[in-house]
């Protein structure tokens, strides 16, 4: 995938493929096939009811009718959320279509910027374009908006700020993404990860990175403002019991220890190999084999590439943590510590970002160290993109 005169056509090709991917929604309109991940949380219906209620700016205890015999306004997203206004201004399906377009476009460019600026370099733009396209056609859980799709873009901005190479656009990304994403589903864990990077710099490099600290504080503050209704629900008793809370309160009893360990092992391996419904990275058939080859190259050639095994390890640990949370072994702890129940282990929403970092780094090693590596990488990327279509 070395640079050449044909590379100038790659952006046009990837753009065309993205248009083809989205085109059924445009051509067939409301007759299109739409994937529904979770019937309990079809957010377009909830937002439609909110828009029709006239309570977008309502008080916390204002009642939204026609849903569970009425729910308080604080149980739904705040008026600072972009998706609320998409549904209000354009209606459910146009809002869904616009949301899908934004997700795909930002996913592509965010991953492209992350790869070319920080991971594979600008001399491998075709590789970056292909991996970014595969990332853009993942089956995203649309109710979380840009919570997953924007992570590469936000990470790229944070890394530039960390290195002191930031521009105004990087601060705009960090300041604006909270209006179109979810703190609860993904970004609380993303912010925690950035905080750990800041602590690492503080301890290992003896450096108080003011800009990185400021960026973390800025994004956290904006999220707290955008999600103020969620914060209100956490702190004050509204008298409303959500489906999630009711489900948690009926958590099964603690299983026998060894049976619980068995469940953890099986679920960890299954999540690692197959992924989940809401955070599916489509890693099974092409990304994992690429990662295996990449790790074999590291072992055989003694290549100093620490990010690949580190990212793979993080994925495995997240699968292990999620399986442990759901095993039942933590039930006594959940009953005693309220916040464990509130913050479901949605660090799994970081997995698509990590899997595609692993994919890109593995393909880079294949290109550099395997005979006909460029051809192999091209085939793997093409198959992964095709897999995303189905």
Where are the regions that the model predicts?
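Membrane-interface coil-to-helix junctions
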Residues: 19-108, 145, 236, 252-262, ...
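Hydrophobic alpha-helical membrane-interfacial segments at the cytosolic entry of transmembrane helices
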Residues: 13-19, 207-231, 246-250, 312-315, ...
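Start-transfer (signal-anchor) and selected internal transmembrane alpha helices
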Residues: 1-28, 125, 211-215, 377
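Transmembrane alpha-helices and membrane-interface helical segments
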Residues: 109-117, 152-164, 194-202, 290-298, ...
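Membrane-embedded helix bundles of polyisoprenyl
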Residues: 108-118, 123-203, 215-232, 384-389
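Periplasmic/ER-lumenal interhelical loops and adjacent helix-loop junctions
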Residues: 227-300, 345
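Membrane-helix boundary/interfacial segments in multi-pass membrane proteins
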Residues: 138-146, 304-368, 390
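Signature aromatic-anchored transmembrane alpha helix within multi-pass, membrane-resident enzymes
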Residues: 126, 364-389
């Amino acid at each position: 995938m070395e640079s050449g005169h044909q590379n100038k056509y790659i952006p046009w090709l990837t753009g065309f493929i993205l248009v083809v991917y989205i085109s059924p929604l445009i051509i067939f309109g409301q007759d299109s096939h739409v994937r529904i991940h979770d019937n309990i949380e079809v957010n377009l219906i909830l937002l439609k009811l909110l828009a029709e209620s006239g309570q977008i700016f309502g008080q916390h205890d204002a009642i939204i009718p026609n849903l569970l015999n009425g729910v308080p306004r604080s149980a739904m997203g705040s008026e600072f959320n972009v998706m609320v206004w998409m549904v209000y201004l354009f209606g459910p399906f146009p809002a869904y279509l616009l949301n899908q377009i934004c997700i795909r476009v930002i996913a592509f460019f965010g991953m492209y910027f992350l790869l070319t600026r920080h991971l594979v370099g600008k001399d491998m733009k075709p590789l970056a374009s292909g991996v970014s396209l595969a990332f853009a056609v993942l089956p995203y859980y649309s109710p979380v908006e840009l919570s997953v799709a924007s992570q590469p873009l936000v990470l790229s901005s944070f890394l530039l700020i960390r290195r002191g190479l930031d521009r105004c656009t990087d601060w705009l990304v960090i300041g604006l993404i909270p209006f179109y994403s979810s703190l609860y589903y993904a970004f609380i864990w993303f912010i925690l990860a950035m905080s750990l990077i800041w602590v690492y710099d503080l301890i290992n490099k003896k450096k108080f990175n003011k800009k990185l600290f400021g960026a973390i504080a800025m994004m956290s503050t904006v999220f707290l403002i955008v999600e103020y209704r969620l914060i209100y629900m956490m702190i004050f008793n509204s008298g409303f019991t959500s489906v999630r809370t009711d489900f948690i309160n009926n958590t099964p009893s603690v299983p026998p220890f060894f049976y619980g360990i068995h469940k953890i092992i099986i679920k960890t391996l299954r999540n690692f190999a197959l992924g989940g419904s809401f955070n599916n990275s489509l890693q099974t058939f092409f990304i994992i084999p690429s990662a295996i080859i990449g790790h074999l190259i590291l072992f055989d050639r003694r290549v100093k590439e620490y990010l690949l095994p580190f990212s793979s390890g993080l994925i495995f640990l997240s699968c292990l943590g999620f399986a442990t949370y759901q095993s039942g072994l933590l039930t006594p702890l959940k009953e005693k510590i309220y916040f464990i129940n509130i913050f479901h282990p949605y660090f799994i929403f970081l997995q698509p970002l990590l899997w595609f970092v692993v994919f890109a780094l593995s393909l880079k090693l294949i290109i550099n160290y395997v005979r006909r590596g460029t051809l192999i990488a091209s085939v793997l990327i093409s198959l992964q993109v095709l897999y995303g279509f189905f």
